Amino acid sequence: MFEIFKKPLSRIVGATFAFAGVTLLACAMENGVAMAEGPTFQDVASQVFGQPVGPDNDGTLYIFGLTAKYTEPEYVDGRGPYKSFLKMLPSIRWYDPEHYWTNGSQTEGVFKNEECVLCHTVQTPTIVNDWKQSSHGSKDIRRGIGIKKDGKPVEDLVGCADCHGNNHQKLEMPTYKLCNDCHPKETAEHRAGGLGSHTHAYTVNVLEFSWHVGKPAEEVTGCAHCHAIAENRCSGCHTRHKFDPAEARKPTACRVCHMGIDHDEWAMYNTSIHGALYEAESARMDWGKKLKKGNYRVPTCAYCHMQNGDHNPQRFGTIYSDMGMFQVDRGAPKHKAKRDSWIKLCQDCHSPRFAADKLKEMDAGVNLSFTKWREAAAVIVGCYLDGVVDPMPEGSAPDWYGHYTFSLLPGGDPRFYATSNLERLGLEMICYLTGNVYKAYAHMSMYNQTYGNGSAFEQDRKLVEIKTEAAKLRRFAAIEKKIGLEHKSADFWKHGEYLDLLPGWKRKPGDVDVEWFKRTDIPHRANADAGVEIHH
């Protein structure tokens, strides 16, 4: 069965694929789209494997996917300043219902709450059970929780029609705006944040953010959904249809979003003494108690960042530092008021001297971590200035601005894709490592400060990788200069089946909504409007 791997045939296959690669690179390019003048890679793969070329959405099992042709899914138009080329998948309707929700119900009629409950007891029984146990569906537990705008307590049940309407052909998907009718205090707090908060997690940090705008919708949909539900819907933290505050008080509610290589707050908390206490005490704790001093033995995400139930976690932060990628000394005199408030919070369990020492420890560790990053950045920028980066910006696909700007320069777009390996390593160092050094110190994760995820020693490894890559580039450049060879970056850095899908190719004059950046009701990301001058 392994005859296919015999050397003669393997040479034929290799030569055939090599021919395909040369053919593809020789394809004429027009407006960033490959114009196939010869056989495509899929055509050659079809000859090798004996499988016809076909669309990737027809249900066929394609061998290694090599004979499949990409088919764009259904999109909906995006929003924001780049709406002319930003696309979303239809599933965004569940996370940004105010702008995308469409009622798909086939049922007709206007129904009372008890009729909704009767039908959905059969159709969606878990939803009904949750509602009956919630403060919306049980008079016994709801009194005194919901307060109307007029200051009177909500005593009647909050039924299906109160949130979704009673006309089945006009059903609505609620947002925080509807919750505001009964929970004005919590809603006001939720809407009081600045840049980097839940308040603007989607409208600013997705619609203006390069890592979303600059990629095909299919691969960044998770980012859009996570950010959108944080901004637009209250059910991200206390899920429907129970909407239990006890659920939102547990760290696992925060873990859904605040985890992973680029912002690993969960791992930092979970590997700290605080996290160990949570694991030990969680089953015995009364999560129904409010977030007040003395109610909890374990410091949780909500206890520290949502003091007394404040729904603006950012209120207790010192300053937004772009997930820790921007340097700031949080212990500096200008931030004394914030520092004092944190020490006061820590006094629930610790002496003020201990708390102050641990926070100073964080300041020192963070400041040192940026010396490594600057050392790495100097190496990277030096290679760019000497023209030895491969590819140089003009040799790669354009960034989402439609530019060919070096990633670390003003107006540049730091990215993991369609860029040189040297720049990619640099972005990993500042985003995956340096940012998480701060999070490790801030959450008292002693191991991760030094050895673990996003640690000082991981920074060391990345710094060596960056210098090794830079040394190779300089050695190659020296050899090429000595033998008189003028290097040109390979075309695969600029074009490919995936690269040709990138939005940067689609940028054209007049495609930016310049008025968006005149809005004063939202903060704006740095560099969000880069290149507007040449695109309007």
UniProtKB/Swiss-Prot annotation:
The GO terms this record gives for MF are: heme binding; hydroxylamine oxidoreductase activity; identical protein binding; metal ion binding
* Coiled-coil residue spans: none
The residues listed in the UniProt record as binding heme c 8, with positions renumbered to this chain, are H274, C346, C349, H350
Residues where heme c 7 binds: C301, C304, H305, H443
Q: What keywords would UniProt list here? A: Heme, Iron, Metal-binding, Oxidoreductase, Signal
Broad class of enzyme this protein falls into: oxidoreductase
Reported cofactor(s): heme c
Q: Any idea which positions bind heme c 1?
A: C116, C119, H120, H168
Residues of the signal peptide: 1-26
Enumerate the Gene3D superfamilies for this protein: Hydroxylamine Oxidoreductase, Chain A, domain 1 (1.10.780.10), Hydroxylamine Oxidoreductase, Chain A, domain 2 (1.20.850.10)
Cofactor binding note: Binds 8 heme c groups per subunit. One of them, heme-4, is an atypical heme c (unusual heme c binding motif CXXXXCH) and is called P460. Catalysis takes place at heme-4/P460. The other c-type hemes mediate electron transfer to the external electron acceptor, which is a cytochrome c-type protein.
GO-annotated biological processes: anaerobic respiration, using ammonium as electron donor; nitric oxide biosynthetic process; protein homotrimerization
Q: Which Pfam families match?
A: Hao_C, Multi-haem_cyto
Q: Where, subcellularly, is it found?
A: Anammoxosome
Annotated hydroxylamine binding sites: H263
Amino-acid positions noted as binding heme c 5 in the UniProt annotation, renumbered to this chain: C234, C237, H238, H311
List its EC numbers. Answer: 1.7.2.9
Positions binding heme c 4 in this chain are: C223, C226, H227, Y451
Question: Which annotated residues bind heme c 2?
Answer: C160, C163, H164, H241
The free-text function statement in the UniProt record for this protein reads: Catalyzes the oxidation of hydroxylamine to nitric oxide with cytochrome c acting as an electron acceptor. Does not oxidize hydroxylamine to nitrite. Also able to catalyze the four-electron oxidation of hydrazine to N(2) in vitro with reduced efficiency; however, this reaction is probably not physiological.
Q: What is this protein called?
A: Hydroxylamine oxidoreductase
Q: Which organism is it from?
A: Kuenenia stuttgartiensis
The upper taxonomy is:
Bacteria, Pseudomonadati, Planctomycetota, Candidatus Brocadiia, Candidatus Brocadiales
